[in-house]
């Protein structure tokens, strides 16, 4: 309420420049307090008593919560330094409610870069690319990190990569470095140029060219058609997702099939 916002290129809603996250949080808190909401801080949910009632603990010690209805909004397990330790599923397991283990969701991916790539290009962006994994695909930007890739083009395909890693132990990320051009158009741009001029002809930057050299056979860089095919489908082996503690969000917790129609 009373927070001026705008919609970014990603479709997400952001506060306008000059408004800090703490300001937004304060406005939300004020709105809730005006509606009679009471916020109790420094309380920890520690489990259930023998009657199935929630048990909490504060500086006075443990106590049982008496309520007609309790809504649990316990969060995931990313960024544990903020308090999201992810231990609550075990408390539900103890009363017979099944849960799925937490896994990283919106997160970076691990790729075993050759040392020269990581050293020379960590921190550099891969702009205006399309990435694909399984049936998922996304346009956007990815940043090369010391450990792999991260960014808004990567996060939408993480579920497909996670499935492949869990099922097969490995996964492949497909990158189209020039989604605005077909293979044929790229070949025409190269024309009769020498291989050493291929990258310049199609406007590849140094980071893009470094990835092509690292993950495609050298002989393919000598053929215009093969070089352009690799530009349109650069395949990178994904070894893992980045740790859950680095993830923006997580999946896991109580599955929908464990809930009744009234979410109890």
PLM segments and residue spans:
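Conserved N-terminal/central alpha/beta ligand/cofactor-binding core
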Residues: 1-38, 43
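Glycine-rich loop(s) and the adjacent beta-strand/alpha-helix scaffold that form part
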Residues: 69-115
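Residue-level recognition of phosphate/Mg2+-coordinating polar/acidic sites
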Residues: 1-12, 69-73, 79, 130-264
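Positions that flank functional sites
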Residues: 13, 47, 107-108, 246
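Core beta-strand elements of the Rossmann-like FAD/NAD(P) dinucleotide-binding domain
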Residues: 40, 59-69, 137-140
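A conserved short coil-to-beta-strand element within the FAD-binding core of flavoproteins
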Residues: 41-53
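Acidic, Ser/Thr/Pro-rich intrinsically disordered regulatory segments
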Residues: 110-142
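Electropositive phosphate-/nucleotide-binding environments in soluble metabolic enzymes
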Residues: 18, 22, 26, 82, ...
């Amino acid at each position: 309420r009373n927070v001026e916002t705008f919609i970014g290129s990603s479709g997400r809603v952001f506060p306008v420049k000059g408004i800090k996250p703490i300001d937004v949080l304060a406005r939300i808190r004020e709105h809730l307090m005006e509606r009679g909401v009471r916020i109790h801080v420094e309380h920890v949910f520690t489990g259930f008593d023998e009657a199935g009632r929630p048990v909490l603990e504060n500086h006075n010690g443990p106590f049982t919560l008496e309520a007609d209805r309790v809504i649990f909004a316990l969060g995931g397990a990313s960024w544990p330094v903020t308090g999201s330790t992810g231990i609550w599923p075990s408390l539900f397991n103890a009363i017979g409610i099944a849960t799925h283990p937490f896994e990283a969701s919106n997160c970076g991916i691990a790729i075993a870069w050759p040392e020269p790539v990581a050293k020379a290009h960590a921190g550099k962006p891969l702009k205006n690319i399309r990435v694909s994994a399984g049936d998922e695909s996304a346009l956007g930007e990815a940043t090369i990190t010391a450990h792999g890739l991260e960014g808004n083009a990567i996060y939408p395909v993480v579920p497909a990569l996670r499935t492949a890693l869990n099922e097969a132990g490995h996964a492949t990320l497909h990158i189209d470095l020039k989604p605005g051009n077909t293979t044929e158009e790229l070949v025409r741009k190269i024309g009769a140029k020498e291989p050493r001029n291929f990258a310049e002809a199609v406007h590849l930057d140094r980071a893009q060219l470094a990835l092509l050299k690292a993950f495609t056979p050298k002989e393919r860089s000598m053929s215009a058609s093969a070089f352009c095919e690799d530009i349109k489908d650069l395949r990178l082996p994904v070894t893992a997702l980045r740790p859950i503690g680095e993830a923006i969000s997580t999946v896991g917790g109580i599955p929908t099939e464990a809930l009744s129609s009234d979410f109890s």
